[in-house]
Amino acid sequence: STGGTVLPLAVNVREYDHLESACGNIIAKFGRLDVLVANAGIGHFAPIDEMEPAKWEELIDTNVNGVFYSIKACVDALKKSKGYIFTISSLAGTNFFPTASAYNASKFAVTGMTQSIMLDLRKYDIRVSTIMPGSVTSHFNGHTPTAEDAWKIQPEDIGELLVDLLKINPRTLPSKVEVRPSRPPSA
């Protein structure tokens, strides 16, 4: 939509106090928080025998702790608004592949954590969904999108999905949504 008010905030999702401050700034500006999208993520890919512990820790801290911190910092505001929480996991949260032990571990964790949080927060009329996309065109992991990425899910497709989910009658909760490209590239 157009004509809305935006409050740009830069935060480090690995720092809980940054997220508490951001949520406080949102409440101060808008009076409430209706939707949280926990979407920060990084990827380090290497076989386990080559994975550097510092890379593992950075990935888990961003992908798992960042989701937890985001939700924890905002949950009281979302209780008041009976809001909606979206976490962005991945198909890598239920499927595994070589060189992805850290990434798979983080996305399995996000998927499981989100489903448990959904059960915890339903009693407050907070809806919680995890979105599990497959290949998305993005700058993830240093990639520069090109025309060859046209077959992939586009970021705006995920945005449209979230808007559609917000429109569903609150009595219905799509708790885990897998999304794939309709037509993968030919071999």
Give the predicted meaning of each segment.
Residues 90:
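Residue(s) in the substrate-gating loop at a strand-loop-helix junction
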Residues 10-21, 53:
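The beta1-alpha1 cofactor-binding region of Rossmann-like NAD(H)/NADP(H)-dependent oxidoreductases
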Residues 47-48, 55-57:
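Substrate-binding pocket helix/loop in short-chain dehydrogenase/reductase
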Residues 95, 116-126:
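Active-site-adjacent segment of SDR/Rossmann-fold oxidoreductases
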Residues 71, 106:
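Active-site helix of classical SDR
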Residues 49, 95-101:
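Active-site loop immediately N-terminal to the catalytic Tyr-X3-Lys motif
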Residues 126, 130-131, 138, 147-187:
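C-terminal helical subdomain
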